[in-house]
């Protein structure tokens, strides 16, 4: 049955970390894991072909004859640069892991609190998510080496950090052997590390704003990764442009950068190999980096052979096939990434379906859900996750298939729907799907009504988890959990700092469009965790109100005028807010009263009440970006009336004049 209970933790192979560690400590022994022995069987034949098996040894990082002695579990924080891929083709797992390092809080949940310096007994534990529950995997720290070289993931340079090596071993144990890591699906690793749901974007066919998508997704704590297409062979090969075919990369950032008097979108990637980088535009040491005068250059760029590099977003979309975004809720792409959307989840765990030998829907399983109200874009995501034990390594197709049908409005669903319901004339709902080895996800836009998910098995008995995500209308959003007001930075002085980002752009006389304005405002005026930032829609609105030339851009003079108002709004917000980041709609009259650029503007109590409804959330709170939009619009509309009125009492406009005024503002 469906439930929303707290996810449980299961001991893999019934091994309890504390019991085993304490037993070893009491006897002065180092743990030896008989369930995943230091033997060729734990590696697998596929990865041992052609290797010098006579020289293969298993050593602990504490061995003094290794160049990494003394070892550390983590030293000065976990980073993607601690990872260096070995002979296994597990870039799909390491790219996901590299992305997870950008969210230290989530990473700590699976790394646990352990070290080589405190209560060391040769035993370590890690957590992975499988079919609705966290699985705790215990390993010993014996790692396969040939000479001084680790066969699989090994520490980079001289940092002596072994958390990536040990975590890779734990994941290999969970899947059965190191060979099971050799080629896999990036979405499966993202789900196994987080328990989230993956949104897959086809870079060749999806019209979307790549820069905004990546920046917003990362700010929302999402894991973001990508993959190149297959080459001419089954093996991953380095291409002439420096990219690797059939290879996974971590997406670590995206920026809009100034170059030759214009703006260019660039994206930053990391290669789990720890080397081998892009050789095209914006590569390390490129003329683009030498010639750019962007003030953030020193913050963004460092010429190092560490596997991380920048490339233009245009080159990225031409050379990569898919972008993968993993979050605890679906990320819909209909109107850009909106991480504050509210979703409800129905979860069906430990589901078992037997093989359907008779065909049709006679042995199917059915799950009913309802869509209550109209919402924009994709509003239902159906996600199946298969238990690894149910997978057949020889079978390429997914072991389940499913469809979603709408139940007629007046048909009462009690128990199973009969086979007659699924006539050849009843069409299934159409959605966007993605299938990997362990996960099958479909996204739908469904009208209000009752629906049934019908699934059948393709082969043997299958155990699975089903999650149905339902988007809630904005009014159902829980403000305490889904709405984080972002804190304002300390007030900027009226004359500004010559080192501020916006002043640098003003000095260079560059025009700014709405996307650039969004980036500047969020960097200069807001700080703290992701939450209510200046959205692109708000910046387009501000742009229209301040754009005197009506060309869709702000010149130096227009931006300077906007900046002075923003600083004044900042002072007002901070002086009237009830607590950091929270201004109540009931205090809007105080705001208007204290806003210098609104002097002489009259606003009735009736209009003030309407504005409180228009610009506050369901809890009566007004964010700083929303307040800015309100105050600038109020000033602009009042000035427009005065300019158009001949007697100060009223105005006469043609339909065209009226439409021009209200539609571009």
UniProtKB/Swiss-Prot annotation:
Species this chain originates from: Mus musculus (Mouse)
Gene3D superfamilies hit by this protein: 2.60.120.380, Cysteine proteinases, EF-hand
Protein name: Calpain-13
Gene Ontology MF terms in the entry: calcium ion binding; calcium-dependent cysteine-type endopeptidase activity
Boundaries of every Calpain catalytic domain copy: 30-329
Domain of life of the source: Eukaryota
Residue ranges constituting the EF-hand domain according to the UniProt record: 534-569, 632-665
Pfam family, one: CAPN13-like_C_EFh
